[in-house]
């Protein structure tokens, strides 16, 4: 997946300006930068979530398997199936654990009970949650802990078999133990999925990502291998940010 010269405006305000960035297959790309720098706006652009905000306009292109996701013929619902999203705050539906994961499958037309059960189990196993919930699938998802709810949301995104997973600060509201489980899960998921993650946590970016992109004031300042970004960045602004001189 790749953005080329992508700019996005909310009304008259430019949120990101001419960003060109490739999200490499089966790698984790971390998007870092101070609050308001455009990293979450960029992330939401990758599956057109910004379309839901009134007054949003864009220029440039975003390619998924060589096709511009803004082409007239693109089915936005299918795009969001192919490019799944996990939000900062876990958002389980007020349904059972099983129905949370099955929701997207049912919307997509899957009706066979055995097939649904197989896909739900596969997704919960993939999200490292199955062993914790297998005996209470009919219970409300709202009864899960915060960390479990976030992994449930990851399972729900995985159930429809996306190609790309977008994560907007998925562990920011979690305690250290739950955060460690999410980070371990991200390591496991990258063998199957292309992942882009927004994080304010520099240590987390260093731990989970293969590549890191630094945004500042709506522009992409620098992108490269994570180790290089944190130990030998090319740009002084990047160095100042990762060493804590501003944030």
UniProtKB/Swiss-Prot annotation:
GO terms for cellular component: plasma membrane. Pfam families: ABC_tran (PF00005). ATP binds at residues 33-40. The lineage of its organism: Bacteria, Pseudomonadati, Myxococcota, Myxococcia, Myxococcales. One of its GO terms (molecular function) is ATP hydrolysis activity. Its EC number is 7.3.2.1. The gene is pstB. The keyword Translocase applies. Gene3D superfamilies: P-loop containing nucleotide triphosphate hydrolases. This is Phosphate import ATP-binding protein PstB. PROSITE patterns: ABC_TRANSPORTER_1 (PS00211), ABC_TRANSPORTER_2 (PS50893), PSTB (PS51238). It is a peripheral membrane protein. Its main location: membrane. Residues 1-242 form the ABC transporter domain. The complex is composed of two ATP-binding proteins (PstB), two transmembrane proteins (PstC and PstA) and a solute-binding protein (PstS). The keyword Membrane applies. It catalyses: phosphate(out) + ATP + H2O = ADP + 2 phosphate(in) + H(+). Keywords: ATP-binding, Cell inner membrane, Cell membrane, Membrane, Nucleotide-binding, Phosphate transport, Translocase, Transport. Part of the ABC transporter complex PstSACB involved in phosphate import. Responsible for energy coupling to the transport system. One of its GO terms (biological process) is phosphate ion transmembrane transport. Belongs to the ABC transporter superfamily. Phosphate importer (TC 3.A.1.7) family. It is found in: Cell inner membrane.
